[in-house]
């Protein structure tokens, strides 16, 4: 069962909204970033608790070791940060300075 307040669900809802607005390319990039992070975490239901400085550092290292370019890594990190910040705004995730 999908957690309605989890990180993955928050990302999916935002991706749906982007598609409804006709922002298909942006939705595609968010979907790729979310999918990649889900694979890294080993679950399609990533929780906000799994988003830590250490997990993001390891994820960046994982992407680099798998041949992704720095531009792609930076883009994916921005997408993840954006999803996390939406969770903070909705009250589903704690604010963590310099996450």
Spans of model-derived segments:
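Basic/aromatic-enriched alpha-helical hairpins
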Residues: 2-66, 85
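N-terminal DNA-binding recognition helix of tyrosine site-specific recombinases/integrases
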Residues: 36-40, 49, 65-99
């Amino acid at each position: 069962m999908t957690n309605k307040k989890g990180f993955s669900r928050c990302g999916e809802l935002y991706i749906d909204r982007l598609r409804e607005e006709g922002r298909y390319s942006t939705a595609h990039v968010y979907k790729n970033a979310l999918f990649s992070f889900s694979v890294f975490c080993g679950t399609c239901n990533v929780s906000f608790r799994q988003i830590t400085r250490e997990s993001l550092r390891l994820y960046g290292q994982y992407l680099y070791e798998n041949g992704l370019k720095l531009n792609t890594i930076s883009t994916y990190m921005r997408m993840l940060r954006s999803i996390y910040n939406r969770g903070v705004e909705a009250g589903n995730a704690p604010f963590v300075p310099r996450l």
